[in-house]
Amino acid sequence: MFSKEGMGDLMKKAQEMQENMKKAQAEIANTEVTGESGAGLVKITILGNHNVRKVEIDPSLMEDDKEMLEDLIAAAMNDAVHRIGEVNKNKMSGVSGGMELPPGFKMPF
């Protein structure tokens, strides 16, 4: 099936892939994206690790009802989470050679 050299090469490539994945995950964790709702009236900036960095609310919304503002904040947060998910997917597909890997995938060595 595999020669010793072939198996060694396979292990080396797997270890390189794991290192590249670690680097990509670190880059993703430091990536900042902004989600918006209400045509930009509410903006939420999050990091790749999903920590919220900033919330911006247009002053004109302070006069409107509380329920609408809550909906806009939730929509902006969902947009930001979706965007960071896309960044994560794109970054990791480059590292994994296009293979879909499960979230949190780690090499067994």
Curated annotation (Swiss-Prot):
Family matches, as NCBIfam families: DNA_YbaB_EbfC
The entry's keywords: Cytoplasm, DNA-binding
Location relative to the cell: Cytoplasm, Nucleoid
Function: Binds to DNA and alters its conformation. May be involved in regulation of gene expression, nucleoid organization and DNA protection.
Protein name, UniProt field: Nucleoid-associated protein Ping_2276
Family: Belongs to the YbaB/EbfC family.
Natural source organism: Psychromonas ingrahamii (strain DSM 17664 / CCUG 51855 / 37)
Quaternary organization: Homodimer.
